[in-house]
């Protein structure tokens, strides 16, 4: 594995490619996190994407430079974490297998079972203390730490979940066989 620094080349590609390549990466926020086991890609011409209708105050980070965080509030309840790729595209972090700061995650989430700590984008946000203040920050700097896998793990792929538009796109990726994904493939 290697630490991602300020080099944006990894993210300056199609979000579909980046979403697949993030599986198996280690990610932490202020030392709390784990291995990314599920992602979804969103593109600017994708009716399910926040960027589909253009730039707004809410999605401005999606149109900023690659390798930055895009944070949004889902259903007025959960902060969701995305990694910005090319302009108007991002990767939603849907699930993480907890590895570091598990007791902190348990306290934040109010649950004991490790599988339930980060299995879903809202749970990821709560467990990692994702907030609007992180929106637009570079992924190569504190409080973030992202280490990409040195070898490609076995992938599962399927249609995205929890959306009502462009549901046919097979842009959801996961670590094959992981029990930490939000939904089975």
Curated annotation (Swiss-Prot):
GO terms for molecular function: alkylbase DNA N-glycosylase activity; DNA binding. This is Putative 3-methyladenine DNA glycosylase. Pfam families: Pur_DNA_glyco (PF02245). It is an enzyme of class 3 (hydrolase). InterPro entries: Formyl_transferase-like_C_sf (IPR011034), MPG (IPR003180), MPG_sf (IPR036995). It comes from the Bacteria. Keywords: DNA damage, DNA repair, Hydrolase, Plasmid. Gene3D superfamilies: Methylpurine-DNA glycosylase (MPG). GO terms for biological process: base-excision repair. Its EC number is 3.2.2.-. Belongs to the DNA glycosylase MPG family. Transmembrane segments: none annotated.
């Amino acid at each position: 594995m290697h630490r991602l620094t300020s080099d944006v080349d990894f993210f300056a590609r199609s979000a579909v490619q980046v979403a697949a390549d993030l599986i198996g990466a280690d990610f932490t926020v202020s030392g709390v996190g784990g291995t990314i086991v599920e992602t979804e890609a969103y593109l600017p011409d994708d009716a399910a994407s926040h960027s589909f209708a253009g730039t707004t105050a809410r999605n401005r980070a999606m149109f900023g430079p690659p390798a930055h965080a895009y944070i949004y509030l889902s259903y007025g309840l959960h902060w969701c974490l995305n990694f910005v790729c090319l302009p108007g595209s991002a990767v939603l972090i849907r699930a993480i297998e907890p590895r570091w700061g598990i007791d902190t995650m348990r306290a934040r989430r109010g649950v004991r079972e490790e599988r339930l700590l980060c299995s879903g984008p809202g749970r990821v946000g709560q467990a990692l203390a994702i907030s609007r203040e992180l929106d637009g920050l570079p992924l190569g700097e504190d409080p973030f730490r992202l280490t990409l896998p040195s070898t490609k793990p076995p992938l599962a792929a399927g249609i995205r979940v929890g959306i009502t538009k462009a549901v046919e796109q097979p842009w959801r990726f996961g670590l094959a066989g992981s029990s930490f994904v939000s939904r089975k493939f």
